[in-house]
A protein has these predicted regions:
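Structured lumen-facing ectodomains of secretory-pathway proteins
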Residues: 202, 211-214, 218-220, 231, ...
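Hydrolase catalytic cores
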Residues: 262-266, 270, 274, 298, ...
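N-terminal domain-start motif of subtilase-like serine proteases
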Residues: 45-64, 119, 128-130, 141-151, ...
Length: 749
């Protein structure tokens, strides 16, 4: 099955925090840059309180499949999709209705029949979980029983090894990028942003002692689960791990990932923040500051991964507990078109439960989106940059540059020495072999193909007193990690951004000072795609993913009290894990302002109104990224989302694959729903077609009454011999003073 990574912290190189769920294990991957090359790694990474994260370089994945356990899908539709029990759009399943009770009993009987069969035919196997909301299924510990034996049982539809998943890591710059404050103001202001909406954070737990989650001023709530870890802001605290009893774990936030995610999603309005002794010059807020949160801990204690059944248990419990949205900043390997965890996400969406999910941190590269982010009806997040970090000042002449620390030594008092530029011909040297001309100086070298440890060690051997490494990709400097080899270098070392390269190379020989006192730096590096952000299309069926991009690099948020000397604690993390709660919080704001909208309509409002033409390439920071399998529909704009006039289902148009040698015409129906209070005619058109040999057309207009739905048909024609590769276009919709757009995609094989 799949393996999901948590997109979390990087407090030491290659440190990982994994999250496990029922049939897949989910991981929170904490990654710090270790290599010189600016290639993205997976998972969410935290630089620690003072370390910024720009592009993760490397991380180690754990196993993607647990072959000792399986999910078994049985015949019979689950409650979320069965025609007599599935809720109407905008509603939830009524568990108290006689129809639902009766059908649940029928499904239970089917599962009991399976358990009886198991006792007779596979007595060593043990049922460890049962499901009826998202799937009619059971989780089974095989205990040596062959998977093929389970497949012979009556009523079995599919037997799938459990996947392993891992965590994937107001002038508030996050909120400014997505126009959150303007969206709040339209709906009554910050005091009502997300009020009454419940979001389940399926992660490592939430530290309720943090001021981000202080419940002062919140009305009394029914608190669920372990009330040692709940209040009237975080209203549920439960553990989901099949070894929880043996491990003696609780919902307590021992790891930092979940608290960081929860802060981005719903931190109380205007919470003062300090990072490593540096006062942040704005008071942070979550995207939905009045939202109610649930701690559904699938990575309890020091547990590093979760299986599919853990995640399924958490999803069904959150739905049953009355939550509206879940946030899954985790990921794992995909099981393709038959992935049961993605099916569960899709089914729950149809039952009114919105799932915001990380795309993964396995980019750059196509086909790297992970499960359950690959689910068709998941709100899947890619990651882009936030333009700020905390670092040390490097002063050369009249100019000061921000530099980032990492695992290497830092100065304890101001250090002044000549800047010694190391050249390899006319280029800045990567210092992957012996260097010269730096004795007594601060060596300026380039990020490149060898590890940071190697290049810094070479500079130290040549007599350098400190090292400044120039990044080779766009964005703010990243935290540098050691490579784990013996005899690590001992001199101070920092990274500076690529944008500062020319100025520093031109200052060769000038006196330079590295300051010991850290500072907050605001930069111009916004809206750069993260190199690590996983890319589509999905495997097997070749659909557009991610759906939309949100801030996910250098995201400031809360972490538990045990992670700093003087709580409350805050840190900058990076990863699609950090982008995901921006989407979950946005969904809460949209749902709060439009409570009758269905899960699909809320998703569409966010995806199909995103800003286009704003995201830049991570390698240069100059060219605009248009590839829909990198950016989806663009970077989210919450103000546009709450003002959406039309909803699309699905949110993108994917024609799958077409052989290059054939001539084919395919059609794709999109359901349009008029979200306004009056009749409207919506005009449709196709623009921005790429490649040769593939053309698109669409129904020119659709007229809909207030709240009504209708169908628009997109037609794709691929000429014989069409150029191989990815072909895309944009479907534009306008009407009633609003507009929307959707990605259109075909893969010519």
């Amino acid at each position: 099955m799949k393996t999901h990574r948590r997109l979390n912290r990087a407090s030491s190189i290659l440190s990982q925090v994994r999250i496990a769920t029922a049939s897949t294990l989910f991981i929170l991957a904490a990654t710090m840059a270790v290599l010189g090359a600016g290639k993205g790694g997976g998972g969410s990474t935290s630089t620690g309180p003072a370390r910024p994260n720009a592009n993760a370089d490397a991380f180690t994945k754990g196993p993607t499949v647990d072959t000792s356990s399986v999910l078994v899908q049985l015949k019979g539709d689950p409650l979320s999709t069965y025609v007599r029990t599935k809720p109407a759009p905008g509603k939830k399943i009524d568990f108290n209705s006689d129809t639902v009770k009766s059908y649940r009993a029928q499904l239970s009987a089917l599962r009991n029949d399976f358990k009886q069969w198991l006792q007779t035919n596979a007595p060593k196997a043990k049922v460890t979980g049962q499901y009826d909301i998202s799937l009619n299924a059971v989780a089974v510990q095989l205990n040596g029983t062959p998977k093929s034996t389970i497949e012979q049982a009556p009523q079995v539809v599919l037997v799938q090894y459990q996947g392993i998943y891992y965590p994937t890591d107001n002038n508030d710059p996050d909120l400014a990028l997505i126009s959150a404050i303007a969206a709040w103001n339209q709906g009554g202001g910050a005091a009502t942003a997300g009020a009454g909406v419940k979001v389940a954070v399926i992660d490592t737990g939430i530290d309720i002692t943090h001021p981000c989650f202080d419940d002062t001023g919140y009305p009394a709530q029914t608190q669920l689960g372990d009330q040692n870890f709940t209040n009237n802001k975080v209203i549920a605290a439960k553990v989901f791990n099949n070894k929880a009893g043996k491990l003696g774990v609780t919902p307590e936030a021992i790891q930092d990932h979940g608290t960081h995610v929860a802060g981005t999603l719903g931190c109380n309005l205007d919470t003062p923040a300090t990072v490593d002794g540096v006062d942040i010059p704005y008071d942070m807020s979550g995207v939905a500051p009045r939202v109610l949160l649930g701690n559904y801990n699938v990575f309890p204690g020091e547990v590093e991964s979760a299986r599919s059944e853990d995640i399924l248990n958490a999803l069904e419990a959150a739905y049953t507990d009355g939550f509206d949205i879940d946030n899954m900043s985790l990921g794992g390997g995909s099981s393709g078109a038959q992935d049961l965890l993605t099916k569960a996400v899709d089914d729950l969406d149809q039952a009114g439960f919105i799932s915001a999910v990380a795309a993964g941190n396995s980019g750059p590269g196509s086909f790297t989106v992970e499960s359950p982010g690959a689910a068709a009806r998941a709100l899947t997040a890619g990651a882009s940059t936030v333009p700020h970090f905390v670092g040390a000042p490097l002063t050369v002449g009249a100019s000061t540059f921000g530099v980032a620390s990492g695992d290497f030594a830092t100065v304890t008092s101001d250090l002044t020495a000549p800047l010694a530029v190391v050249l390899d011909g006319s280029n800045l040297s990567q210092a992957c072999s012996a260097v010269s001309g730096v004795s007594g100086g601060i060596a300026l070298i380039s990020r490149g193909t060898c590890t940071f440890s190697t290049k810094i060690r070479n500079a130290q051997a040549a007599g350098a007193v400190a090292v400044i490494v120039v990044n080779n990709v766009a964005g703010d400097p990243t935290a540098m990690g050691q490579d784990g080899t013996p005899n690590q270098p001992t001199i101070p070392a920092y990274m500076v951004s690529l944008a500062n390269k020319a100025a520093l190379v031109g200052a060769n020989g000038q006196s330079a000072t590295i300051g010991a006192a850290l500072a907050y730096f605001s930069t111009t590096n916004a809206d750069i795609m993260a190199g690590f952000s996983s890319q589509g299309p999905t495997d097997v069926d070749f659909r557009v993913k991610p759906d939309v991009v949100a801030p996910g690099v250098n995201v400031l948020s809360s972490i538990p009290a045990s992670f700093c000397d003087t709580p409350p604690c805050f840190a900058f993390f990076q990863g699609t894990s950090m982008a995901t709660p921006h989407l979950a919080g946005s969904a809460a704001v949209v749902k709060g302002q439009h409570p009758t909208w269905s899960a699909a309509q809320v998703r569409s409002a966010i995806v199909n109104t995103a800003d286009q033409g704003v995201l830049r390439d991570f390698q240069t920071g100059l060219s605009t990224v248009t590839n829909v399998n990198i950016i989806g529909s663009g970077r989210e704009n919450l103000l546009s989302a709450v003002n959406a006039k039309v909803a699309l289902d699905p949110v993108s148009v994917s024609f799958g694959s077409v052989p290059s040698g054939s001539s084919q015409t395919k059609t794709f129906n999109v359901t349009l729903t008029n979200l306004t209070g009056a009749a409207a005619t919506f005009s449709l058109s196709i623009a921005n077609t790429t490649g040769t040999g593939v053309t698109y057309s669409v129904t020119p207009s659709v007229s809909l009454g207030a709240g009504a739905s209708g169908t628009a048909t997109v037609t794709m024609t691929a000429a014989k011999g069409s150029s191989r590769g990815f072909h895309q276009a944009t479907l534009n919709i306008s009407g009633r003073g609003g507009s929307a757009h959707a990605a259109v995609f075909t893969f010519i094989k």
